[in-house]
Structure formats: structure tokens, C-alpha cells
Amino acid sequence: MKRFALFIFLILTICSPTSVKAQLDSLVYSPESAKLNAEGKNELRATVDAMTFFRDNEYNSKHLIKGYTLPGVWLSPSVSYQPLTNLKFETGVFMLHFWGASNYPNANYANLESAEAQHTTKAFHCVPIIRANLQLTPQVNIVLGTLYGKSAHGLAEPLYNDEMNISGDPETGVQVLYNPHWMDLDAWVNWQDFIFRDDKRQERFCFGLSTRFKPSRRKARFQWHIPLQLLMQHTGGEVNTEAQDRSIKTWLNAAAGVGFNVPLRTQCPVSLGAEFLGTYFSQQCGTALPFDKGYGFLAQAHAQVWRVRLTAGYWASHQYIPILGSTLYSSMSTSTKGITLNNPRMFLLRAEYAQYLGKGFSWGVRFGFDLHHESGVWNANDHTYTHRSMTNDFDAGIYLRLTPSFLIKKFKTDQTK
């Protein structure tokens, strides 16, 4: 682990600058935009979207989550056609491969940590890519099929685990995007599991809403925003009478707060910012989880210097359970059933570096350090309560993103009347 960190440090030290942009989310995780270009009308294009990655999670909080490593690549070649200035179709395939893996769970990859090696496929995990993108106005897009998802939603860490950018399936369903100058709105339904009659699995889908209000004037130096986010996971179904578990389960996560960003007048591009979030958890239906309600508070400060983004934050919660967020923010263990944490606290540090290499190519690295502290740990299996514990966790990852696009043919517009 120390050699891996030293290797990344040396790369950062000797690399030469080619861009002043620096955000792992925008450059590496979610570089594509849903906005359609009028110049793309009648174009037939081939795109090769891929990411190679190596992420190591050294978790010492064994009572909460076990450590693991994700080495691999995902590849998503596709062909797109834009018959109109405001309509685009895309089809392809998404393939995920972990180095050294020969069997893959045959399921929707929404939480890789809980996936079991049963009903497997060989060589790689594969799902289709089919998307229709209709741009009703310059500010409104309706997407059917494969969504612009994952980090593109802009969800906070307690609601969404950034690791799903490398291990999660593409989201599928319906999505509405609304982006006037004063706000960004993203509403979607991600249909994760479809069932047939007498299916042994349950129907499962997730509804999400991510809004970011921007009251500041466009040219104002001090930019502040108000995030409002919601995730609701539903599991059920009426036609799967053979399922072992037919109980309805509905869970909700929400977050709201305020944040700001201020660019400094320096020769080197520098900006400072902070964000304060309150989060909420609710078990709307079912008794699968140990808590019915919970909450948490996250305060973060960040500094963007050249291509480097540094973040420091503090998290405090009570009976909060993330639906799609990292277990590090949870009051419930995923490594051992029956273990819960009493009032967990976490001090977190993040360091990110992202570099634009050229059109269709970018790379980045990320380091994370977390210091956990809770009032106590309750084990329902043997009815024991351990007072006060403190642990630390570390993660590091390196990512290379490729999104080259090739024009196959531009069809001529029919001028006949």
C-alpha cells in the first residue's frame, strides 16, 4: 500500500500541465453532457467509452465494513444517430471485467459489496446500452433507456458512493433534466430489477431527485447554492408469488443545505468553498433495517488549487443508513449482520487530482482518509455493547477515462419539398 501511494505521488510530481481544470467528477467520472449540439444533426457516430481503474480500500473499521480492492476495466462501445437537432438515439453494450475474476454475479450491480457469487456469468459482466435523448428546449431534456447517471446526478457522499462509477451498472429508466441559469434539476427513475410471473426475485427501482438552486448573479464572484436531494428505493412486486421474500420494502434518503464557492485573484487558479448538509433516513415500509428513522450532518470545506482539490469535513449522525451511499456513513454494519453503531462520528480528508489529456482522454487519482469514532457498538447476535471505539480507514485509486468519438457518416439533408 505504501509503495502504491509513493508511485502516485511521483506521477503527480513529474507530470506536465496541459489544463487548469481539476475535478474527478467532471473530467473522469461523468465527462459527457446530455445537451445536444445542432451541428450533430444527421451524424452517425461510433464512440468508445472506457475506464481502467485500480482502487484499494484499506478499511480498519472491521465491525462496519471489510476492506477490498477493485482492479479492472469497463468498456462501453456504442453507435449513435442524431436524425434531428433535438433528438438522438444511441445503442451499445456495457462490459465490466475485474482482473483475475472468472465468474460474475448475474444481477444488477447497484451494490457490489453485497453481491453473491451465485447464478454467475463467465468472463465479464455485460448489459445493453439503449438511449433516446429528446431535447424539448435548450434547458429541458427527456431521456429514455440508459440514463446520464452515477456522479452526473451530483448527489452528496452520504447519499451516493462515488465507487459506483467504476463498479455499478448503467442506470436505466426515465430521466428529466432541467437546466436554466438559476438552477440544475435532475429527476429520474432507475429500474433495477424487472420480474415476471412467479419470479423468485423482487421488483426493485429507485426514484431520485437532485436539485441545485443558484441564486447568485452569473457574473458575481461569490457563488452560492442550495442543494436539495432525494433518493427512494422500493422493493416489492405483485406477480412474484414464488419469491422467498415478498415483503414490501421502501427506504428514503434526503439531503438539504447550503454551499458557496469563491475564486481567488491569484496567478495560479485557486478557489475556496464550503458546504453544509443535513441528511435524513426513513424506513417507509418493512422491517428489514434495524432503524426506522435517522439523520446526519455533514460540514465540508474545500480548496481547488490548479488541478488539485483538497477537502476536509466532519460527519455526525444518529441511526442514519445510506441507500446508495458508502457504508462509512452508516450506523449499520454491512460486514456483520446485527451490528449497529451508536452516534457515529467521522473526520474525513480527500485529495483529488484530475487532468485533461486531450479530446476524449483524461485521468485522475484520489486519496481518502477517515477517522471514525462512535459512542459504542451494539451486537444483537450476542447482546453485547462495546463502549467507545476509534478506527481509521484509507482508500486510494487511479483512473484513466477514454471517450473518443468517430464520425462514420454525415447524411445529407433532404432538400426536396
Protein language model regions, located:
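Sec/Tat signal peptide C-region and signal peptidase I cleavage site
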Residues: 18-22
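Surface-exposed coil loops of outer-membrane beta-barrel proteins
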Residues: 141-212
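Surface-exposed extracellular loop regions of Gram-negative outer-membrane beta-barrel proteins
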Residues: 76-97, 177-188, 273-275
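Transmembrane beta-strand segments of Gram-negative outer membrane beta-barrel proteins
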Residues: 26, 34-58, 87-89
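Surface-exposed loop and membrane-interface regions of Gram-negative outer-membrane beta-barrel proteins
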Residues: 87-135, 157-158
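Surface-exposed strand-loop-strand hairpins of Gram-negative outer-membrane beta-barrel proteins
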Residues: 51-74, 104-105, 117-118, 382-385
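Sec-dependent N-terminal signal peptides
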Residues: 4-14
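Exposed, low-structure sequence patches enriched in small/polar residues
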Residues: 3-4, 24-26, 49-51, 72, ...
